[in-house]
């Protein structure tokens, strides 16, 4: 998978770890008095590399040497695997540590440890991720994302909405998009023509795509041509109940938990690495309609969470088909 491309006091206790028996560790730096440091802004650093001694010390040194202070650090070293994952949040003075210098410092760190992934984000300075949303007839996830975006709860810029379902100018979605200057593209699809070339042309400048109940299977050729991450919402608790109508499948199976799954899109249907899952208990009193209603509520929150995790640099690949979510 392709994860965020943007490339990346002190922790005195972290320097004493010469051996680590932990699977995961979270620790926080000293708090800062914001009233005495009005110029400090927030940064995030994500790191994935082969595990060797001294990584935590070097990350701390990189930030502290520029006058920064780590507020929190999340570290994961899988048992019996020489792999290191970390996510650090820090504050710094942009007058003392300019954005380009920060990029170069973290690039040096990445080269030092032969990092597989090194990313840094400064939300106050960096442009937001650009996304396109693909949706079909059911619009509960699309509407929820648009409202969250309007309320400032999704740190993205929506370049366009693409749908294979026609929505007239008097629909609430069309009016919302028109009011906010977001283009709406209706591309009617068929079994023989999924309009993938046209979609590719519309989304070429995006950072990643979101499938908000887009009921079309994207081809392997599309995935390779786009070459970036695509986040999907599945209205079922994967890996169970793949494919169409998972709510009906789950209802017929008599499950006691209903769920929703947000995952990366791969060539295998509903089998990509999972980013987020949410569940709700149901009972014998639920009918199929209440089943679906509960599922839709889960889908909205699950998809929004996955997008937020991705934008906040919380997602890293782990093993062939898993993720680390900080």
What kind of region is each of these model predictions?
Residues 30-38, 121-125:
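Flexible hinge/switch segments at interdomain interfaces of large molecular machines
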Residues 37-49:
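Short glycine-/aliphatic-rich beta-strand segments at the starts of folded cytosolic domains
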């Amino acid at each position: 998978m392709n994860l965020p491309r943007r490339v990346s006091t002190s922790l005195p206790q972290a320097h004493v770890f010469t051996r680590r028996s932990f699977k995961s560790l979270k620790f926080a730096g000293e708090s800062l008095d914001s009233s005495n440091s009005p110029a400090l802004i927030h940064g995030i650093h994500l790191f994935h590399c082969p595990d060797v001694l001294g990584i935590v010390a070097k990350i701390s040194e990189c930030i502290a040497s520029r006058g920064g202070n780590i507020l929190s650090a999340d570290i994961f070293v899988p048992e019996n695997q020489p792999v290191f994952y970390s996510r650090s949040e820090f504050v710094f003075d942009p007058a003392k540590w300019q954005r380009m210098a920060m990029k170069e410092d973290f690039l040096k760190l990445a080269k030092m440890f032969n990092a597989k992934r090194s990313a840094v984000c400064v939300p106050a300075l960096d442009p937001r991720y650009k996304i396109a949303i693909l949706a079909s007839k059911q619009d509960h996830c699309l509407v929820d994302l648009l409202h969250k975006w309007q309320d400032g709860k999704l740190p993205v810029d929506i370049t366009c909405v693409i749908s294979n379902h026609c929505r007239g100018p008097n629909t609430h979605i069309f009016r919302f998009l028109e009011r906010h200057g977001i283009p709406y593209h209706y591309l009617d699809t068929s079994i023989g023509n999924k309009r993938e070339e046209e979609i590719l042309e519309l989304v070429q400048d995006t950072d990643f795509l979101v499938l908000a109940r887009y009921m079309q299977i994207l081809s392997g050729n599309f995935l390779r041509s786009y070459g970036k991450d695509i986040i999907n919402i599945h209205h079922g608790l994967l890996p169970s109940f793949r494919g169409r109508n998972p709510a009906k499948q789950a209802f017929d199976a008599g499950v006691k938990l209903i769920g929703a799954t947000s995952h990366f899109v791969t060539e295998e249907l509903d089998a990509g690495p999972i980013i987020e899952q949410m569940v709700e208990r149901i009972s014998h009193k639920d009918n199929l309609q209440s089943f679906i209603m509960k599922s839709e509520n889960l889908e909205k929150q699950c998809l929004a969470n996955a997008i937020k995790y991705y934008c906040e640099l919380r997602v890293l690949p782990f093993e062939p088909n898993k993720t680390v979510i900080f």
